[in-house]
């Protein structure tokens, strides 16, 4: 019995040691992995802390610069530093006072006089009222002509004016009648009254299967068909 127990212990000893070694290797690798991760996290935390410190320093510097600018801003300048403008003198009032006192002032006053538009002895022309004038059943208001001012000016008579207008109207009508046919002739566009033929390609040469007429007569069906085609072309 003792020999059998010794044999069993010697047989299982290498397998048990290998199992223990593998477990130790696995535990060591897991510990190494977590240690690397923790060290990487610590490094990132340190970098973030350094960046925060730099940003805080920049903000403090900007705040200091802003306070300095506000302290030396142009709004803080006292109003006493700006000298007030001297009062402006009223030269018109001074000139009137000097002239009233009889002294010759440095700035004499000038009286403005409007230009004379009307000539002496000329009165305003009376406003003419329009009159009703009827001609061939058509009535219209006609304003009478007013006499012009000045010597030698003469108003035309209404008869001459109406005659000249009627002549111009007749001349315009005559020219319109003479020009209208020429314009219509140039503007008219000539179009085809007949519809265009069907664009079908036809052979002008006679069909060899039909042949000529009997006894060399050329007035057969092929010649008649050719004449018909030529007549259609001439008509178009």
From Swiss-Prot:
Cellular component per GO, a single term: membrane
Compositionally biased spans, kind Polar residues: 93-102, 185-195
Residue segments, region Disordered: 83-113, 185-236
Transmembrane segments: 15-34
Biased composition (Basic and acidic residues): 225-236
Signal peptide interval: none
Primary location recorded for the protein, binned into one broad class: membrane
Protein name, UniProt field: Uncharacterized protein 124R
């Amino acid at each position: 019995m003792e020999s059998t127990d010794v044999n069993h212990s010697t047989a299982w000893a290498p397998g048990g040691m290998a199992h223990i070694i593998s477990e130790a290797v696995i535990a060591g690798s897991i510990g190494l992995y977590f240690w690397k991760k923790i060290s990487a996290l610590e490094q990132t935390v340190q970098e973030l802390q350094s960046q925060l410190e730099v940003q805080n320093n920049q903000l403090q510097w900007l705040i200091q610069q802003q306070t300095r600018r506000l302290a030396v801003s142009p709004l803080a300048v006292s109003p006493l530093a700006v000298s007030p403008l001297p009062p402006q003198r009223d030269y018109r009032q001074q000139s009137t006072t000097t002239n009233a006192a009889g002294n010759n002032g440095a700035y004499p006053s000038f009286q403005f006089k409007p230009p004379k538009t009307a000539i002496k002895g000329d009165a305003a022309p009376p406003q003419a009222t329009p009159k009703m004038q009827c001609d061939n059943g058509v009535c219209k208001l006609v304003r009478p002509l007013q006499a012009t001012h000045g010597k030698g000016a003469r108003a035309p008579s209404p008869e001459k004016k109406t005659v000249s207008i009627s002549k111009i109207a007749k001349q315009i009508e005559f020219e319109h009648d003479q020009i209208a046919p020429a314009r219509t002739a140039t503007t008219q566009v000539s179009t085809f009254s007949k519809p265009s033929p069907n664009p079908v390609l036809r052979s002008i040469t006679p069909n060899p299967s039909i042949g000529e007429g009997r006894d060399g007569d050329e007035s057969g069906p092929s010649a008649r068909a050719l004449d018909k085609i030529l007549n259609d072309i001439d008509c178009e």
